[in-house]
Amino acid sequence: MAKKIAILTSGGDSPGMNNAIRTIVKTSKIHGIEVFLVYNGYKGLVEKTIKNANEINVDQYIGSGGTFIGSARYLEFKKLEVRQKAVQNLKEMGIDSLVVIGGDGSYAGAQLLHELGVKTIGLPGTIDNDIASTEYTIGLDTALNTIVENVDRLRDTMNSMNMVALVEVMGHGAGDLAMLSGLATGAEIIVTNAHRKSIDEMIEIVKDQMIAKTKRSVIGIVSEFIYDDLKKVAKEIEDKTGIRTRAIILAHTQRGGNPKAYERINASFLGIAAVESLLKNESGVALGFKGNKIISTPIPEALKAQNSAKNENELVTKINKINQS
């Protein structure tokens, strides 16, 4: 059974991370487990920027976005001697267990520590929803709400001015943010890695929607990294249709903001489950959702799992047909 637990957040921040941290701290205290907070991800493990959670009122962050303990990408952690330093720091403080909240890169780090004898649990924290071992990642719902709110505002002004807007959203190769926000906003064009469109195809959609069907606007939602320069795509559409077209990059706004209720609830349940897993002496596993249940998957399996590109393509095709009809 765990006696001292440390928590870190790693990689890109996501709304809801603070809620997971809060419930890990409070659940641990109920079971008499001492909790420590690692600041700035794996880098903090190596530099020993670790504080006792008793010094912090975690309840004050229940409605705050981001992660109050900070996060970082730390490529140095791939080196064995660097990881050994991290393990040494944990041992010196008597910490035997670690909960890592982050994406697949964070999971990889947790697995490496597990192999060095540290009990580790991974929680899925990323707005991209790109961890195939879970149906839902901490941050997805709030990021979707942020995208939808921005697209709704864009629709107002695009309708007023008879314009086209191409909105780039995050995803890290996964299409969930584009697909789901496209469904929620009625975007006439949705482009993901699994469902790509040429510029000529988008031009034909714009002509059909705004000239043949006399719609006042077209919204396209595009996953990041599909096109080298979305502004050039927008200009080509404008040049070939005569309809003013703008590229909108939402960028890091998607990662910020107060976590929505659904986010807080799911993150909290995962935090509780993380402590319960450690109480059962589990290690080297990633927790996630399947339906309404929290499941446990060995981290190597979680890293190998892949979402179906075919399913995504079929879903986006259906949504595009509905939104263009």
UniProtKB/Swiss-Prot annotation:
Keywords: Allosteric enzyme, ATP-binding, Cytoplasm, Glycolysis, Kinase, Magnesium, Metal-binding, Nucleotide-binding, Transferase
Pathway listed: Carbohydrate degradation; glycolysis; D-glyceraldehyde 3-phosphate and glycerone phosphate from D-glucose: step 3/4
Activity regulation (UniProt): Allosterically activated by ADP and other diphosphonucleosides, and allosterically inhibited by phosphoenolpyruvate.
Catalyzed reactions per annotation: beta-D-fructose 6-phosphate + ATP = beta-D-fructose 1,6-bisphosphate + ADP + H(+)
Binding site for substrate: 126-128, 170-172, 224, 246, 252-255
Cytoplasm is among the record's keywords: yes
Main location: cytoplasm
GO molecular function: 6-phosphofructokinase activity; AMP binding; ATP binding; fructose-6-phosphate binding; identical protein binding; metal ion binding; monosaccharide binding
Source domain of life: Bacteria
Binding site for ATP: 12, 73-74, 103-106
Cofactor names: Mg(2+)
Coiled-coil zones: none
Residue sites binding Mg(2+) per the record: 104
Location of the active site: 128 (proton acceptor)
Keyword field contains Magnesium: yes
Residues given in the record as ADP binding sites: 22-26, 155, 186-188, 213, 215-217
InterPro entries: ATP_PFK (IPR022953), ATP_PFK_prok-type (IPR012003), PFKA_ATP_prok (IPR012828), Phosphofructokinase_CS (IPR015912), Phosphofructokinase_dom (IPR000023), PKF_sf (IPR035966)
Cell location: Cytoplasm
GO cellular component, one term: 6-phosphofructokinase complex
Documented EC number(s): 2.7.1.11
A GO BP annotation: fructose 6-phosphate metabolic process
Quaternary structure and partners: Homotetramer.
Similarity field: Belongs to the phosphofructokinase type A (PFKA) family. ATP-dependent PFK group I subfamily. Prokaryotic clade 'B1' sub-subfamily.
NCBIfam families, per database record: PFKA_ATP, PRK03202.1
PANTHER family assigned to the protein according to its UniProt record, in alphabetical order: ATP-DEPENDENT 6-PHOSPHOFRUCTOKINASE (PTHR13697:SF4), PHOSPHOFRUCTOKINASE (PTHR13697)
Protein name (Swiss-Prot/TrEMBL): ATP-dependent 6-phosphofructokinase
